[in-house]
From Swiss-Prot:
Protein name: Glutamate--tRNA ligase
Pfam families the UniProt entry points to: tRNA-synt_1c, tRNA-synt_1c_C
UniProt KW keywords: Aminoacyl-tRNA synthetase, ATP-binding, Cytoplasm, Ligase, Nucleotide-binding, Protein biosynthesis
SUPFAM superfamilies cross-referenced by the UniProt entry: Nucleotidylyl transferase, Ribosomal protein L25-like
InterPro entries, per database record: Gln/Glu-tRNA_Ligase (IPR050132), Glu-tRNA-synth_arc/euk (IPR004526), Glu/Gln-tRNA-synth (IPR000924), Glu/Gln-tRNA-synth_Ib_cat-dom (IPR020058), Glu/Gln-tRNA-synth_Ib_codon-bd (IPR020059), Rbsml_bL25/Gln-tRNA_synth_N (IPR020056), Ribosomal_bL25/Gln-tRNA_synth (IPR011035), Rossmann-like_a/b/a_fold (IPR014729)
EC id: 6.1.1.17
Superkingdom assignment: Archaea
PANTHER family, sorted: GLUTAMATE--TRNA LIGASE, GLUTAMINE-TRNA LIGASE
Length: 562
């Protein structure tokens, strides 16, 4: 299917799901998700996709649906089939009216743990022909200061995972919205400015008693709020609290903090600088936005249950109806460092292959399809679940095996002279079944090639070996003068009765550095044609690796898994 045909399929489907109007960004994302090989040409294909999107948007709804059913009927069912595989029906869901969101904090790069709510929320929105929102929750410039580069990085990671979004928001640019609702809340008597010292407040809270500011008239509260907004209070001198139940069994729920002062002259926000000093907490901003953005279903981890309780008080004060909230169990990822703080301490950058960031996993060689499949298989179970490196590797192998070039690589190399009466030729396919092409090597009589020392030791015991796709050789010993092993030509055709090992070999070798994340880097000799490859390779008998570039005629590889 060419680019125009792919674009037509996904533009029609996107228009069908969204009232007849296709959006360019999600169509581009869908095209690249179906044909990842087009990613290097993305700048060239975007004008083509844009032209197709405009063409589709000029069609009537009836015409869009007719063409979609006639030419791409599978597009109407494929997303539903994917979703049914790992996700149960969504409660309180009405087709065409479901709206979900992914709300990352851009204080670090997107991690494997973040991928679960992103993938699941997106899948549900599309399964129910709804909408999906990307919302950056960046309202803490002090303790969770946003990384300027993380905004775009997260968007790139989502696109790579095959996730498109219909709406995009930045909470730091919605401060006036929050201030307006805060005033409304204060006027309704649902919030108040508290200037109690923290120790005094905690004592009152633990005793279930109100602080002196709680019952001040709304008019006085609004005057205090004006003073806070004018900068008359310093950091830590005042907070705004939402009135809840002072006898609530969970003390943290009692009159929780909705806004706090942050000195942005010392802690400027990367997008708004020092413009604002009063910043909403997670529960206020997230709760307000879920309502104003029309989010119908919030899917998040079980540790957010307390936040749901807090937000229920906010909604009650404002007369709003809560969205359907689904809490799934904890996800333990064995063999990965997921803590953002630990990754920072270790000095991991966003695409460090040792880190469990989406960028790191991508660079290491994990395919987006594998990550999606694993997360969908875990789903929204309320019980805790665990994913091991082996789980992810098994799914990844299913995806990449057909795309991985088979490469001969020799670690602990030893030279071997081939004693043959005439030149020998070998044609080796890059893949045994997938038609990825081949390469040819010609070996002259007496030419030296490189084998693994362990293979030569076994050849000594067995009397010989077979060089892959070349010929069978007898083991003739070691020439001390030349410092080479001697192998004598025996026959061309494969002869299983001999019981020889079939081993890899390298002629005119190039160097390769193989990085096993978390371990040492090792050196190997590889066949020269390997330096032209991109993407995945399978180092024969060793495992899969991702090409990480070529430097000074040396191939850099990141070892992936067996």
């Amino acid at each position: 299917m060419d680019v125009r045909e792919l674009a037509l399929k996904h533009a029609l489907r996107n228009a069908y799901l969204h009232g007849g109007k296709a959006q360019l960004k999600p169509v581009v994302t869908a095209v690249l998700a179906e044909s990842p090989e087009l990613r290097p040409k993305v700048k060239e294909i975007i004008p083509i996709i844009k032209e197709v999107v405009e063409e589709v948007n000029r069609m009537s709804l009836e015409e869009q649906e007719r063409i979609l059913k006639e030419r791409f009927p599978e597009a109407l069912e494929e997303r539903k089939k994917e979703t049914r595989k790992g996700l149960p029906p969504l409660p309180n869901a009405e087709r065409g009216k479901v709206k979900t969101r992914f709300a990352p904090n851009p204080d670090f790069y997107m991690t494997l743990g973040n991928a679960r709510p992103a993938i699941i929320s997106y899948e549900y929105a599309k399964a129910y022909e709804g909408r999906f929102v990307l919302r950056f929750e960046d309202t803490d410039p002090r303790t969770k200061r946003p990384l300027p580069e993380a905004y775009e990085a997260i968007k790139e990671d989502l696109s790579w995972l095959g996730i498109g979004w219909d709406e995009e928001y930045y909470q730091s640019q919605r401060m006036e919205v929050y201030y307006g609702l805060l005033r409304e809340l204060v006027r309704r008597g649902g919030a108040y400015v508290c200037t109690c010292p923290p120790e005094e407040w905690r004592k009152l809270r633990d005793e279930g008693k109100p602080c002196p500011h709680r019952d001040l008239p709304p008019e006085e509260q609004e005057e205090l709020l004006d003073q806070v907004l004018e900068g008359k209070f310093g950091e830590g001198e005042a907070v705004v609290r939402v009135k809840t139940d002072l006898r609530h069994p969970d003390p943290s729920v009692r009159d929780w903090v909705a806004f706090r002062i942050i000195d942005t002259s010392k802690h400027p926000h990367p997008l708004t600088g020092d413009k604002y000093v009063l910043w909403p907490t997670y529960n206020f901003a997230a709760g307000v936005d879920d309502y104003l953005m029309g989010i119908t279903h919030v899917l998040r981890a079980r540790e957010h249950r307390q936040n749901t309780v807090k937000q229920e008080f906010l909604y009650k004060h404002l007369g709003w109806t809560m969205p359907t909230v689904i809490h799934f169990g904890r996800l333990k990822l064995e063999g990965f460092v997921l803590s953002k703080s630990k990754m920072r301490e270790a000095g991991f950058k966003g695409d460090d292959p040792r880190a469990a960031t989406i960028r790191g996993l991508r660079r290491r060689g994990f395919a987006p399809e594998a990550i999606r499949e694993v997360m969908l298989s875990v789903g929204i179970k309320s019980s805790d679940a665990s994913i091991s490196f082996a789980n992810l590797a098994a799914e990844n192998k299913k995806v990449i095996d057909k795309k991985a070039y088979r490469v001969m690589a020799v670690e602990d190399p030893a030279p071997a002279k081939l004693l043959a009466p005439e030149p020998l030729e070998a044609e080796l396919p890059w893949h045994p079944t997938e038609g990825l092409g081949s390469r040819k090597y010609s070996v002259e009589p007496g030419e030296v090639v490189y084998l693994e020392r362990a293979d030569l030791r076994r050849a000594k015991r067995r009397g010989g070996l077979r060089l892959m796709e070349l010929a069978n050789f007898k083991y003739k010993g070691f020439d001390e003068d030349e410092g080479v092993y001697l192998l004598e030509f025996e026959s061309k055709e494969l002869d299983k009765e001999k019981g020889y090992d079939i081993v890899q070999w390298v002629k005119d070798p190039k160097g390769a550095i193989v990085w096993r994340p978390g371990e040492r880097k090792s050196f190997a000799l590889v066949e020269p044609e390997a330096l032209k490859l991109e993407g995945w390779v399978q180092l024969i008998r060793k495992g899969y690796a991702k090409v990480d570039g070529v430097e000074e005629d040396t191939l850099n590889l990141i070892y992936l898994h067996e």
